[in-house]
Each structure stands twice: as C-alpha cells, then as structure tokens.
Amino acid sequence: MVQGSDVFAMSMLTIDWVTFLLKLVLVPTFIGVVSLAGRRWGTTVSGWLIGLPFTSGPVAFFLALEQGNFFAHKASEAIMVGIVSVFAFCLAYSRLATSLTWFPSTLAGMAAFLACTFLLDMMALPLLVGFALALLVLVVSALLMPHVGSDRISAWRSRWELPARMFSATALVILITGVAPLVGPQLTGLLSPFPVYATTLAVFVHRSQGGEEAVKLLRGVVVGSFTFIVFFLILSLTIVAWGVASSFLMAIGVSLLTHISSLQVLKFRNRFPGLG
C-alpha cells in the first residue's frame, strides 16, 4: 500500500522533472527567438524582449505550486526588488563596454549584481517601497547608460553562434536554479532575476558586434524591465487572495500591455531598423 509520504515524494519528483524539462526547452527556445529578433530588428529589440519575466515568472509559478501561495507572495516581493541588481549589472557592464572587452565588462557587471543583491538581502522593504525603489533605479540606470548610435544589423560570425548562445544560457539557468534553493527563500527570490539572458547575449553581441551594440542591448533590458516590475507587483498583490490561475492571468495580461507601451519609449530614444 502506498503511503501518503510516498505519494508526496513522487509528486515532488515529478514536479522537479517537469521543471528541469521546461528549462531544457524554454530557455534555448527563448534565446533563439531573441537572437533572431536581434538579427532582424537590432540589439535594442533583443534587450527589450529580455525584459519579460521568462525566467523568474516560471520560478514564482512553481514556488506557488510547491510551497503555497503565501510563500510565492513573499518570493514575488523579493524577485521584484531583485531587478535592482539587474539594473546594477546592466549599468556596470555598459559603462565599461565601450572601452573594454567583454570579459572585464562581465566581471564588473557580475560584481555589481552580487554586491547589490547582498545589500538588498539585508533589507526588509515593504512592497510599495520596493516597487518605488525598483522604478527609481530603472529611471536612473536608463539615464546613466552611455549614449551610442542607432542600431545596425550585423551578421553572426559563425553558424555555431546561435547554438552556443542557447547552450550557454541553458547551462547558466540550470546552475543558478540548482544553487539558489541552498541559500534560503529571501536570497532565492533576489537571485531569481539573475541576468541569464542579458549576460549570455551581451557577451556574444560584444564579441561579435562590439561594445556599443552590447550597450544597446542592455538599454533595451533596462527599459523593458518595467514590465518585469509590474508583473511581480500584481502577483504580490493578488496571489494570496485570488489564487494561482487568476493572479498569473492578470499579471500576464497587464504586463503584455505594459511591454508594448515600453517599446514606444525605445523607439523614441533609439531608432532601429524595421520598426520605425
């Protein structure tokens, strides 16, 4: 006779396998779509697409299924504030990218991300204060990004570049999500926005097209991340009262409308081929 604990263990194992398979499928698919969009419309559009919560959204969803709605509510608050660390990464990388190679730029970006995450982990910000902080840092980061020219469409150096991007991003997601549960729920939430896609694409774009193109990509990430902030604000406000399905549907719907609006900001600041 199967015990209740055995059923629970089997269900958790199933969820783990489903989550792992989703990582193997969704991450390379998204990287492929974003890379092809950048090839067609320019790197700014690639960065703008990265602003969608394609990594942290599923993390919050599975946390709700595994740990309950209140746990997901608290994690969503931390995830929303964690985007501040992503802005620190983008700004640090961009300030060096126009004069240095991808390696020191990446080191600076990672150092900024980790330092910011460490500071945020020592704070316990109320939801609306965290929301205001995220918006403020978004605006400041966008204003401090280096000014570069309009997007240009560049061919990839090798036919292996796209598969390499997809593999690198997938490996990074598996590594981060494997380590994160070991450091506690608060830090897990703060680490969930880890700039997997931004790091992968910025490095490849920097190597193949130059530092200015990497800056354009990361500017797109910063502006597009307004959607990220809105998504997790709505999720934090609704998931306990409304449940998983209704709260996620509301967050997704409002976020998509927000993301379309944010594209107009990018079109105003930086004209790119095929969209103007």
Question: Can you say where each PLM-predicted feature lies in the sequence?
Answer:
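N-terminal signal-anchor module of multipass membrane proteins
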Residues: 4-50
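Structural signature of hydrophobic alpha-helical transmembrane segments
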Residues: 15-27, 49-53, 67-85, 127-137, ...
